[in-house]
Every structure is written in structure tokens, then in C-alpha cells.
């Protein structure tokens, strides 16, 4: 009877070790997946920042420069007026 209890205790210990190792692996996987999801979200936010902020500002800058060049091309020359 004593030997059966010893084998049962060893079996429970091994099963406990296996459960502990599996739990640690799952915890590590969850942490790694959370880190990768956070990294991916940061990359997406940077892309959205590029789309919403950088691209429109470059567009506005280029259009403003085009209008400025067009205005300088079509404006009449300054007339010399004698001081009165």
C-alpha cells in the first residue's frame, strides 16, 4: 500500500511539473503576442500619421508654391511713379 502511495505522489508531482511548464509557455506566448500586436499597432499609427498629416502638408506646400509661381508670372510689372 505504501509503494502505491509513493508512485501516486510521484505521478502527481510529474503531472504538476508538466502543467507548470505548459502554463509558463502559454504565459510567454501571450506576452510575446501582446508585444507584437502593440508593435503592429504602432506601425499602423505611424502609417496613419503619414497619411493624415505628412501627405496633406506636402500637398498643401506644393500647391502653395505653384500658386505663388503662377502669381509671379501673371502679375503686371510695377510702374515707376514719380514722388508727388
Curated annotation (Swiss-Prot):
The chain crosses the membrane at residues 19-39. One of its GO terms (biological process) is viral budding from Golgi membrane. GO terms for cellular component: host cell Golgi membrane; membrane. Residues 1-18 are virion surface. Residues 40-80 are intravirion. Pfam families: CoV_E. It is found in: Host Golgi apparatus membrane. It is a single-pass type III membrane protein. Keywords: Apoptosis, Host Golgi apparatus, Host membrane, Membrane, Transmembrane, Transmembrane helix. Plays a central role in virus morphogenesis and assembly. Acts as a viroporin and self-assembles in host membranes forming pentameric protein-lipid pores that allow ion transport. Also plays a role in the induction of apoptosis. Belongs to the betacoronaviruses E protein family. Homopentamer. Interacts with membrane protein M in the budding compartment of the host cell, which is located between endoplasmic reticulum and the Golgi complex. Interacts with Nucleoprotein. This is Envelope small membrane protein. It comes from Bovine coronavirus (strain 98TXSF-110-ENT). The lineage of its organism: Viruses, Riboviria, Orthornavirae, Pisuviricota, Pisoniviricetes.
